[in-house]
Amino acid sequence: MKKILFPTDFSPAATNAFIHALEFAKIVQGELILLHTFDLPIYDNQYFPENYNVIFDSLQLSQFDAFKDEIPKLRAIAEEQNLDKIKMSHRLMDGDLIYNIKKVIKEDKIDFVVMGTAGETGWGTFFLGTNTGSVINAIDVPMLSVPLEAKFKKIKTIGFTTRYRTKDKKALKEVITIAKKMNAQVRCLYVKTSTSDVSETTIKKWDTEFAKEPVIFSVIPSDEIKETIIDFILFKEIDLLVMLAYKRNFFVELFKPSLTEKFANTSSIPILALREKKSRNFEEVAAG
C-alpha cells in the first residue's frame, strides 16, 4: 500500500487539502499518515530551576490535547466524502517542520506528500516563503501542493510541461499512469523558443510513441515561457499541473501576481511536483 504523508496545522488551507489527500489516496490505493508539528519555546533553565520540566510537560500535553481534538473532525470529513475506509494514522512531533517531514519520509518510506497552502496572492506567496514552499525543495518524493482556493473536483485534464528530454519522457509515462487511474487526459505543452534545439524529428517520435496513450501534445512558439504556460492552464482548462525538476525561483516567477492577476483561476489548481532526483522510482510508486 502506498504511503501518503499529510502535514497539517489544522488551518482552513490544510483542511481543504485533506480532501485532496483522501481522493489521491483512493486513486493510488494508499494510506494517509497525518503529521502535526509544533515548536516548544526555548527556556533557560537557570531561571526555572524547579518547574522547568513541569512547563514543558504542560506545553506538550496542551499540544496533544489540541491534536486529539482535531483528529475526529478530519475523520468526520472523510466520512462525509465516503472515504472513511482510507487507512489513517497519526504522528505528533515537536521541532522543525521540514526536518520532521524528512524524518517521517525516511522512517515510514513515504511515497507522496500532500500539503495545503494559502495566501492573498496565491502561488506567488506560496513559493516565496510559506512552509509548503520550503518543503517542496527539501524532499525527494513527489509532492501535491493544494492552494486554499482549489476545492476538490474530478480531475479531467492534467497539464504537463516538457522540453522533450529523456527524463521528461520518463516523467510523462509516470503521469500517464496517474491519469489512467483518474480516467483523465494529459495535455503536454512544449514552449518552443527562438533558441530551441529540439528537432522536429524528436517531436514526431514522441507523437508516434504516445499515439495510443491519452495524451495530446501542444507545441507553441514563444519566447514568453511563463506567460505561455499561464495561458495554457487557462485555455486548456487544466485541473492539475505537473512539473518536473523546476527550481523555486521558476515557480515564483510563473505565479507572481503580475502574471496571474488577469487569470484568477490559475492560482487555484493543485500542482504535482516531481523530483528529478531518483531516490525512488515514481512509476513504481504510482502503480497500484
Q: Language-model segments: which ranges?
A:
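Small/aliphatic-rich secondary-structure junction motif
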Residues: M1-V54, T157-V219, I238-L240, T266, ...
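Charged helix-capping and loop-helix junction motifs
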Residues: L128-N131, T202-K204, F255-T260
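Helix-enriched interaction subdomains in cytosolic or periplasmic regions
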Residues: F112-A138
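Structural beta-alpha unit
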Residues: P72-V113, F210-E261, I269, E276-G288
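A short acidic, glycine-rich active-site loop
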Residues: N53-A66
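Short, structured interface segments
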Residues: T132-A150
